[in-house]
Amino acid sequence: EQLIELVGPWKTVYIVHFNGET
């Protein structure tokens, strides 16, 4: 449960960061 809450916003940040690097 706690992991999902942390992964929620983290996933978005990771996608945005990866998209900006490409």
Curated annotation (Swiss-Prot):
GO biological process: sensory perception of smell
Disulfide cross-links: none
PTM (free text): The N-terminus is blocked.
Keyword annotations from UniProtKB, A to Z: Olfaction, Sensory transduction, Transport
Family, as annotated: Belongs to the calycin superfamily. Lipocalin family.
Function: Binds the chemical odorant, 2-isobutyl-3-methoxypyrazine.
Subunit structure: Homodimer.
Name the UniProt record assigns to this protein: Odorant-binding protein 1
Organism per entry: Oryctolagus cuniculus
Lineage of the species this protein comes from: Eukaryota, Metazoa, Chordata, Craniata, Vertebrata
